Each structure stands twice: as C-alpha cells, then as structure tokens.
Amino acid sequence: MNTHPTATLHMASGSKIVIELLPEAAPNTVNSFIYAASRGFMDHHAIQRIVPGNWVDVTYQAFGHKECQYLIPNEFELHPEIEPLDSHPGCVCMGGYGEDGLASCEFFFPLRDCPDHKGIYPVFGKVIEGMDEIWRLEKVKTRPVDFPIPGVEVNEPVEPEVIEKVELDLKGQTYLEPIRMKVQNLPPCWTDMR
C-alpha cells in the first residue's frame, strides 16, 4: 500500500493535477509544501510564470503571502545521504535563489529534461494525474512581465489560470514544520510584499 501523501490541485479550468509527494527524496521540501498547502496559501492563486519548452512556474512571489516568505536550506545540506532525483517532465520541483536557499513553496513543473537542476532544485513529487493539464498550460497565451532579477524570463498567462484549491491527503501521517534558513537575504521579487 502506497503511504505517500498526495496533493490535488483543483484548477478553475475544471481539470485537476494530482501530485504524489516524495518525502524520502526531499523531506524538508515536502514539509514546506505541506505547511503552505495545509494553510490554504495556495488556494485561489493564478499561475504566474510559463516558459514554453522549459517549465510552468506556479509562483515567484511566495503565493502573495508573507507567511510563505521564507527560505529553506538546500536538501543536500540537511540530508547529504540522499541521492537527488533527476528532473524531467512529470516531476515537481522546488524553486530557489542560489546560495540564499530554496524558496519556501515556489514549486514548478519542468517541461523538459533538466539535468543541470539535479541537486539544486529538488524533485519532491511526481505528477500521477493531470499531465495533460500541464501540457495545456504550456500552450496558453502569455505576456511578458517586468522582473527584478536580470536574465530571468517571466511570462504570465493573459487569461488567469487559477488553482482554486489544493487538497491534501496525508494518509494519516503527521509532517513537521519545515526547517528554515536563519539568516535570509530575501529575493528582490518579494520586495513589494515587505
């Protein structure tokens, strides 16, 4: 029997994306995702960034909640014994800000194999239902958005693509609050939230 927790993203389009979370692959990252999702911080959120051929980036502003405005250590710092998973379509990865740490809950769906992401943007889940919705999102019409980090391409959907609700099934397990970075250089894309 599979005891992995799942997260179901109910989309305003009527579709759903079901993610199997992988706590043995990225324990603290899974804890951080569950922390945000269980408090409703991801609900009613419009997807903020789509880069066709690369990824669907759900948010780059901590879902607009100051409670999600924290960084977590890279998994290899907490769990050097865990071999990171390869990043490819069908995976769910956590974004990050280089040496400053991983984003608290800013996850993305890769649209191609990303060998350069291994060990940097941890794979913490896999899509078990709804890849067709992710491929649909790749093709929606987008417009460019000014972004405060040089060299980062940001295009948002012209028509909002909204996650209405994230439904968790923790399979009766309890998950701890995430370990957070003690000293934080917060990303410039969070500036307008301070």
State each model region's role:
Residues 1-194:
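Cyclophilin-like peptidyl-prolyl cis-trans isomerases
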